[in-house]
A protein has these predicted regions:
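N-terminal "arm"/small-domain region of PLP-dependent enzymes with the aminotransferase-like
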Residues: 1-33
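Conserved N-terminal alpha-helix of the aminotransferase class I/II PLP-enzyme fold
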Residues: 24-71, 97-100
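Conserved PLP-enzyme active-site core in the AAT-like
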Residues: 3, 10, 42-43, 55, ...
């Protein structure tokens, strides 16, 4: 089927660099091939620089941003866990939907779409639900373009609650200090 060229300017998918497209013409490497493992190690090291973390478990997920968020939630949440989720756009709302599908009890911290969520509201919610498994928020909400402040949420790291941040839109464009902000 002949396809016409497209210029993709949305948050994803996007047009790859010609070098990336050319790489598709090369023979595949198996996932246990020493060259593949070296490439994966290099990729993880570069990701650690972008995420500003020293965590050796920094790794890419082969899928959409929503697939990454879902992978995170299904590995962290069990039925009857509490998830506190900041919602000020489509992707905060999607977090709620995925958490509910995991069987979690969702505590929504809603803000008008297009306005940032006051981080103190999330901190106060965690204090009200001290056994919450996660506090989750989108760093830069794709649907509205609003940036939510994450640094104050580092206080959550002093509890047993995990801090989950969706940085699909912001990573690489806005500094994200995973270690400094104590993001799990």
């Amino acid at each position: 089927v002949p396809l016409t060229d497209r210029l993709l300017l949305g948050p994803g998918p996007s047009n790859p660099y010609p070098e990336a497209t050319a790489a598709f013409t090369r023979p595949l490497l198996g996932h246990m091939d020493p060259e593949f493992l070296a490439l994966m190690d290099e990729t993880m090291e570069r990701l650690r620089a972008v995420f500003q973390t020293s965590n050796p478990l920094t790794l890419p997920i082969s899928g959409t941003g929503s697939a990454g968020m879902e992978a995170c939630f299904v590995n962290l949440l069990e039925p009857r866990d509490t998830a506190i989720i900041g919602v000020n756009g489509v992707f905060g709302n999607r977090m709620c939907e995925v958490a509910m599908r995991c069987g979690a009890e969702v505590v929504r911290i809603d803000e008008e779409w297009g306005k940032p969520i006051d981080p103190q509201l999330l901190i106060n919610a965690q204090k009200s639900y001290p056994h919450a498994r996660v506090v989750a928020v989108v760093h830069a909400e794709t649907s509205t373009g609003v940036e939510n402040e994450i640094a104050p949420l580092a206080a959550i790291a002093d509890t047993d609650t995990l801090l989950v941040v969706d940085a699909v839109t912001s990573l690489g464009g806005i500094p994200i200090d995973v270690d400094g902000w104590r993001i799990d």
